[in-house]
Amino acid sequence: MHSTPGEQKLSGEVRHGDAFDLIGGLLDRSVDLILTSPPYWGLRTYGLDGTMEFAGSAVRGGGSAPEPPSYESYRDAGGILGLEPFPEWYISHLVEFFAGASRVLKRAGSLWINLGDTYFARWASIRDQGRQGYSEGRTRRRAPAGGYRHEKQLLLIPARFAIAMQDAGWILRNDLIWAKPAPLPRPESDRLKLSHEHWFHFVHRQPSARPKYYYDLSGSEEGGRDVIICAPTAGRAGHSAAFPPAVIRPRILSSSPPAGLVLDPFCGTGRALTESLELQRNALGFELSEVYAAVAESAVRASLADLAAKGHCSVGHSDVGCHQ
């Protein structure tokens, strides 16, 4: 399809597979914005089975976490991101991934990452298929205690991750708090409800100058404040971790130029991708779950078709940002 004057050609694509592998297929400095929410540690399976056997005696005996293995070694032993036996391993694997992703992010690009926290328990339930309710099936994970890993301890995973990213060379520009006005009911009666999550904004460190990156403050929330109050929205196909548009649209508008490329390497059912397309950005997503990848791909196709029907864009080729 040929573009008419004033019409934007947009591309959208979802690739099924492990983000650690798929990121290698992208061109250097091809992405304007990475906007994503990795699987939270130890909370949900999203239908993918992991194994705790890789931790060996450390899991059975407790104590200090052994040195984190590379993600490839962990995966080769059957491990899944988010189901590591130690939160330290999980944080290490996230930092490892984003170190690799830095190659594809433009020098003027931004990285926005959403993370929530959790409490430690040696035996804990993992919600199946990412659903939030209490009636769905669950699996059980075992995590060894030791150090700060103590029963009922709030783990501060977002803070530990942010500091690890700083240590890895990223510049942290914002810690945006997403406050949820009506959190889901919880059975605990000895603590307050977790009713907020973090959105971290990272940019490249420049070796000889202050960081220079694309940013349009007029695209952010009114007043440019670092707290947004917004209720979660229902996801597609039972996915509970979908982004509310009111939370992610300001990230897209402020941190990527029109016609830029937005990458969500853990795209779930594709909410960030369809919102990016609506805002006249190209969109690319990676998803490990075959079910969710299919849902996301369908949503992207529908969004592109709708935009084309309204005359807002023409559909481009789908090889966005990839090696030829």
Question: Where on the chain are the PLM-derived regions?
Answer:
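S-adenosyl-L-methionine-dependent nucleic acid methyltransferase catalytic domains
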Residues: 1-209, 214, 218-324
